[in-house]
Amino acid sequence: MGLFLQHKTDDIQWAVWKMEESLDALLALLPDARRVFCEQDLNRFVSERRKMEWLSVRVLLYAMLQEDKEIGYSPEGKPYLTDHSFFISISHTKGYVAVMLASFTPAGIDIEQYAQRVHKVSDRYIRSDEQTEPYQGDMTWGLLLHWSAKEAVFKRMENADADLRKLRLTHFI
C-alpha cells in the first residue's frame, strides 16, 4: 500500500501517499460504489499522470477515514467534501499526493519535489523584505519550505485572488 506518512490529532489529520500502484490496483482499494464512480470519472482526464493523481487522492482519503467520501470543487477550484464533514486540502508533486483534513477550520497543505528550479522562480513568491534561510545548510530546501508554507496558507485562505508575494512570512523554521 502507498501510505507513506500519516499524522493525526483530535482536530486535524494529514497523510501522504506514494503513487506506486497501477490504476487498476488503486481502484481495487476503493469500496465498490466509489470504484464504479471513479472508473467513469477517470475518462475525463487524458494524462495518465493526472489520472493517477486524481485517483490516488481518493484512495488516500479512503485510507485516512475508512469511509467513502466524495470530493467536490468550488467554482474557484477549491476542494471540499460534499457532506461537509471536514475541511480538505489536497496537494501533489511528482510521485506523491497529500491530503489534509480539519474538523473546525479551513485546511492548507502543500508538498513539493526537491528541485533546483525553485531558485529561478523565487522572485514570484518571496517579498523583498522577507529573508529566506537555508534549511539544514541547504538553500534549496529553505526556498521550498518558504514556497510550501505560502502555498499552504494560500489554500487555507478564502480569497482566491490572494497573491503569494503579498503574504509575508517571518522566521518559521
Q: Positions of the model-derived regions?
A:
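Core catalytic alpha/beta fold that binds nucleotide/phospho-ligands
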Residues: 1-173
